Regions:
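A residue-level detector for the "anchor" residue at the start of short, highly conserved motifs
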Residues: 3, 7-243
C-alpha cells in the first residue's frame, strides 16, 4: 500500500549534504530522504521553516517542491515536529496507518514498523488525524492529548496525557514509565544500536526509570533494569539476552 504523498523516485541525501547543498540537488529526482541511523538523532530545517528532530532508526521523505503547492511528508519511525504556521498550505505527515494535518503546531509522532501501536502526542496547537486502517471521521487533538492507534484493529483512542516526556529523546534521555520490558528493549536497540533478546517469561515485566544515553552505557542500563526487575542478562553471540 502506497501513501498518497509518496513519489515514484527517491534521492537519498546524507544529513550533512542536505544542509550544505540542498539548493543544488538535481531536478530530475522528485524526493529527498533524510535518515537518522541507529544510535543517533538528526535535526533538520524544512524549506518552509519547520523543524524536525528524528529519533534513532527514523526517516522522513518529502518532495523538492515542499512548501510550494503542499507540505506533505512521510515518516517512518519517530519524529518531533515544530511546524511553521501557514494557513494556506497545511502541513501533513503521511503513514500507512494514520495521516496527520496541521496549520502550525508542535507534536511528537511515533510509528516504528515493528511497533504494535502508533502514538501521537500534541504539545501545542491542534491536529486532525485520519485513520488509514479503517473508515471513520477525523479525530482532533488538543494540547496535552495523546492518540494511540492499534495497528491490528485500527482502533484510535484519545486521552489526556502528560506530554512533556514525549520528546525528551531529543536531549538523549530515556524515560520508561512502567513500560513493558519488550518495548523497552526496542528503544534500547535503536538508541544504542545493539541487539537484545527478551525471554518469553519476561515480556510482560514492566520497569520505571530514566537514563542519559550519552552518559549511561547499555550495560549500566541493563544492570539497573536487572537489579529492580528480578532478572539477569548476559552478552552472547553479539547480542544481550535478558532472562
Amino acid at each position: 500500500q502506497r501513501q498518497m504523498c509518496i513519489r515514484d523516485r527517491v534521492l537519498l541525501v546524507p544529513f550533512a549534504t542536505y544542509y550544505q547543498g540542498k539548493h543544488t540537488v538535481k531536478q530530475n529526482f522528485s524526493d529527498i530522504v533524510v535518515e537518522a541511523s541507529l544510535g543517533t538523532h538528526t535535526k533538520l530545517n524544512l524549506p518552509d521553516g519547520s523543524l524536525v528532530w528524528l529519533n534513532a532508526g527514523s526517516k522522513v521523505t518529502y518532495s523538492q517542491g515542499f512548501g510550494v503547492d503542499d507540505r506533505k511528508l512521510t515518516l517512518e519511525g519517530e519524529g518531533y515536529f515544530e511546524v511553521a504556521h501557514n494557513e494556506k498550505v497545511p502541513f501533513e505527515v503521511c503513514t500507512k496507518e494514520v495521516n496527520l494535518r496541521v496549520l502550525g503546531t508542535k507534536f511528537n509522532f511515533k510509528n516504528y514498523s515493528n511497533d504494535e501501536e502508533v502514538m501521537i502526542s500534541l504539545v501545542e496547537g491542534k491536529v486532525a488525524l485520519q485513520n488509514g486502517i479503517k473508515a471513520m471521521e477525523e479525530l482532533y487533538l488538543e494540547p496535552n492529548e495523546r492518540m494511540v492507534l492499534n495497528k491490528l484493529t485500527g482502533e484510535m483512542v484519545k486521552s489526556k496525557a502528560n506530554v512533556e516526556y514525549a520528546n525528551i529523546w531529543r536531549d538523549n534521555k530515556l524515560f520508561f514509565d512502567e513500560e513493558l520490558l519488550e518495548d523497552i528493549a526496542k528503544k534500547l536497540m535503536r538508541s544504542y544500536d545493539v541487539r537484545i533478546e527478551v525471554a518469553d517469561s519476561l515480556r510482560d515485566r514492566r520497569f520505571y526509570g530514566d537514563f542519559m544515553i550519552n552518559k549511561n552505557t547499555i550495560e549500566e542500563v541493563l544492570e539497573a533494569i536487572a537489579s529492580t526487575s528480578r532478572m539477569n542478562y548476559r552478552y552472547e553471540n553479539g547480542k544481550y539476552i535478558l532472562y
